[in-house]
């Protein structure tokens, strides 16, 4: 969903490809490739750890990074994020919530979208799912998010009430 959100929101990039860091989990790469094939857009896997970010030449609509990476490394992604932004690309970071208690969050590094799984916070295993996850966006991308946003309000008697704040 984050890749599709970047493609919807980054109208300036047109039909440019999405670049995936080679240090993403293999299952994440497989899911994104499957969606890309079904929807007809190009995906490229590249090592994005180089000094210039390792971004391939040509037009890019967005990049996807992971923190920590598949190999367990914790990398400062601010350089590749800045390089991607300079080229008009949006950035998604797949981030482990527990790791974010110790490292710089994706939003503070300039990422547009952060996603991840929350199963490690005590949701019991349930034969592969379902379990909770999160999708967070920078300000201004809320209307590009899929689904519905629920807001907290007060009813006529002053009690807490939940309402649909946004539906896409």
Residue ranges and their predicted role:
Residues 68-87, 98-105:
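Active-site core of PLP-dependent enzymes with the aminotransferase class I/II
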Residues 45-49, 63-64, 81, 91-95, ...:
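Pyridoxal 5′-phosphate
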Residues 25-26, 46-53, 70-71, 97-101, ...:
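Short acidic loop-to-helix transition motifs that present clustered carboxylates
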């Amino acid at each position: 969903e984050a890749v599709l959100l970047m493609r919807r929101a980054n109208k300036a990039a047109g039909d440019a490809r999405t670049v995936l860091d080679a240090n993403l989990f293999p299952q994440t790469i497989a899911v994104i490739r499957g969606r890309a094939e079904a929807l007809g857009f190009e995906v490229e896997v590249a090592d994005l750890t180089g000094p210039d970010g390792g971004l391939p030449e040509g037009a890019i609509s967005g990049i996807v990074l992971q923190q920590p990476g598949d190999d367990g490394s914790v990398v400062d992604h601010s350089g590749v994020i800045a390089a991607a932004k300079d080229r008009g690309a949006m950035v998604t970071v797949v981030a482990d919530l527990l790791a974010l208690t110790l490292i710089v969050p994706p939003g503070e590094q300039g990422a547009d979208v952060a996603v991840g799984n929350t199963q490690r916070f005590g949701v019991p295993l349930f034969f592969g799912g379902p379990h909770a996850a999160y999708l967070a966006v920078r300000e201004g991308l809320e209307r590009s998010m899929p689904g519905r946003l629920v807001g907290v309000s007060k009813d006529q008697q002053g009690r807490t009430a939940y309402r649909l704040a946004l539906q896409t």
